[in-house]
Amino acid sequence: MVWIVEIGYKKDVTDPVGFLTKKEIEDLGIKGVEEVRSLSTYAIDGNISEEQVKKICEELLADNQIQHYGYRGKNIDKSIKHEHPNAWLIEVGFKPGVMDAVGMSTLNAIEILGVDGVKGVRTRTKYLIIGDVSEEQVKKICQRCLVNPLIHNYSYQKIGGK
């Protein structure tokens, strides 16, 4: 079974990845972006319980002072909700066959934590681009700021708004 875990910064905390991404978008000359929020996403493949997923989140992946987490698995959905009246959600991940160093080190850390049964971990990054941005601009953001086409795949979807 695969558990999807998302780690993001709390609303009242500056998201450093989002902050820098917003600056890069502005450097492209794209106007209308109010805020960028990032989420680190982990696909944890293994025979583990919801309690073990919580342990991984709380003791390894998230800093509970500044971050929050969500997760979903079979018949369980406690994921972070990506709701905003006018935003785009972009997901960036490695292409098949590309080494995921963060995923590999996360797998190793899970083993050290004492959680058995995990076979693999793959990572992705989600970006919530909040503001008045066109689909053409989102493609430009992906291609010029977020994605290396040799190693990454990406997808995007409009959330709410116009």
Where are these regions (language model features)?
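Non-catalytic terminal accessory/regulatory regions of metabolic enzymes
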Residues: M1-K162
